[in-house]
Design a protein with these regions (language model features):
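Charged (often Lys/Glu-rich) extended helix/loop segments that serve as interaction or gating elements
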Residues: 111, 117, 122-186
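Flexible glycine/acidic-rich beta-alpha junction loops that bind and position SAM and/or redox cofactors
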Residues: 78-98, 128-139, 167
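Repeat-solenoid scaffold signature
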Residues: 103, 114-115
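Short glycine/threonine-rich loop-to-helix capping motif typified by GTGT followed
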Residues: 52-58, 89-107, 137-148
Length: 186
């Protein structure tokens, strides 16, 4: 497969994938065309922003890339993978921290899959998404020991034994229950 990188208007420039507007991308597609034992099965993209408004641009971009690749190769790849970057189930306290409504899975489908259904009514190619953390994000609990609590200009900071990967560094805090000596203090 080929991972594609193009502008979806989210303000993020990713280092991953081939920029579809460059000679490097064209060279990869030409390599596939000229190599008899290579068949392109998958075109893939992945973008960081989870906002549903970028999913229409993601789908349109992949449709444009698919059309371009198909015109060169003479076939549409078997799969188009729109990657991940989907909000999952979350508690109301967490949702409120994002400042905009959290989309449901059907909102992403409407924004992206509708365009593919219109373009490919025979249901080929297969359309994939990678929900990853959207499905697993609310399935576990982080437990750690509090090492210190301090107040800086009216804001409390808690230092725990754990990884920064377990607690957001972006100021988005997962719902918390605080226990002291086995007693819920929330």
């Amino acid at each position: 497969g080929i991972r594609c990188n193009f502008d979806v208007g989210d303000g993020v420039i990713s280092r991953f994938g081939f920029d579809t507007e460059t000679e490097d991308f064209d060279k990869v597609v030409e390599f596939v065309k000229e190599t008899s034992n290579v068949y392109l099965v998958n075109l893939q993209c992945h973008f960081a922003k989870r906002n549903v408004e970028f999913w229409g641009a993601r789908a349109k971009g992949m449709l444009d890339v698919t059309d371009r690749v198909a015109s060169i190769l003479g076939y549409v790849p078997d799969r188009i993978d729109l990657g991940g970057g989907i909000f999952g189930n979350m508690e109301k306290d967490l949702k409120r921290q994002f400042g905009s409504p959290i989309p449901e899975y059907k909102d992403y489908a409407k924004a992206a899959a509708t365009l593919f259904a219109e373009r490919f009514p025979d249901k080929k190619p297969e359309l994939l998404v990678e929900p990853g953390s959207a499905l697993a994000g609310d399935s576990m609990k982080f437990v750690g020991r509090v090492e210190s609590i301090k107040n800086v200009r009216g804001k409390q900071f808690v230092t725990m034994l754990g990884s920064q990967k377990n607690i957001s560094m972006a100021g988005i805090n997962p719902p918390m229950k605080i226990f002291k000596n086995g007693v819920n203090r929330t």
